[in-house]
Every structure is written in structure tokens, then in C-alpha cells.
Amino acid sequence: MSNVGIIGGADGPTAIFVTSALPRMLNPWGMAIILLMMIPNVIFALRHRNMENRCKSRFINILEQIGRYGCFILMIICIGLDKFGFGSVEDFLIYLFGSALLLLAYFIFWILYGRSPSRKKALALAIIPCCLFLLCGVTLRQWPLVVFSMLFCVGHICVTLS
């Protein structure tokens, strides 16, 4: 197993970067994104243990969960590819910096929401992960991740608005 990943197309490698010693179908960046996203969610869940889901639609709740867990799995495991990788340096940079900016926005909105909860902030906290999953799916050309991100988006926003 190699610790070097190559970004490039049919005309040859465009760039070489060091990756983890994980199997090539695992996405170490996706693992980090999921772990970072979960930090404020776990803190919130521990502080609000008795909070109930106000969405009474079983269909919407199931749709959200299918989308959520599909995104979590596909952010970490690249299905349908023989290895994890990007089509170009640009894809990698968009993925890296776009994800970083969306995570930063997510953390900022969690801080703002923690200080004074509001519907608008809750909606931002629902939309940002959807955008993050969609960005990752498109830049990695992981079309199943794009599909699951859309399912999650519809379900998560509906649950948040209820």
C-alpha cells in the first residue's frame, strides 16, 4: 500500500501528494470532515438530551436518515471506484478549501445558535452540511454521494422547519 496519491488525468500525473496508509478506497479527508462536523452535534445532543423531533412525518424522518447515513458512509468509503482520488488539482483545491470554508461557517453558526437560537440559524445549520456533502460528491465525482446529499437536504431542511 502506497502513502502517495497522484492527482491527474490521462495525460499523466498533475500532482503528487502524501495520503494516509489507509486502503485506497477510503477517503481520509472525508473521515476528518465527518468527525469535525459531529463535534458540535454531539455537544448539542449531550446538552439537550430531552429534545424531541417535532417533525411528525415518518417519510421525511426516514428520508433524512437515509440521506444522512448514506452521506456519512460515502464521505468515508469511495464506492464504485478502485481508489480514492481527484480528477485534477483544481478539484482537490475546491474540495479542500470549499470544505474548510463550509466547516468554518458551520462552526460559526453553531456558536451563534448556542448564544441565541433562532429559526434562521437552525436553517443555516441544516443547509451547510447539505452543501458540504454536495460539494464533496461533485468534486470527487461520487454520484451516489450527490444523490444521498440531495435526499439528506430535502429531509434535513423539512425536519428543521417543522
Locate predicted features:
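Hydrophobic alpha-helical membrane segments
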Residues: 98-110, 118-143, 148-156
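N-terminal signal-anchor transmembrane alpha helix
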Residues: 23-43
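Membrane-helix exit/interface motif
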Residues: 74-85, 105-113, 136
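Membrane-interface helix-loop junction between the first two transmembrane segments
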Residues: 42-59
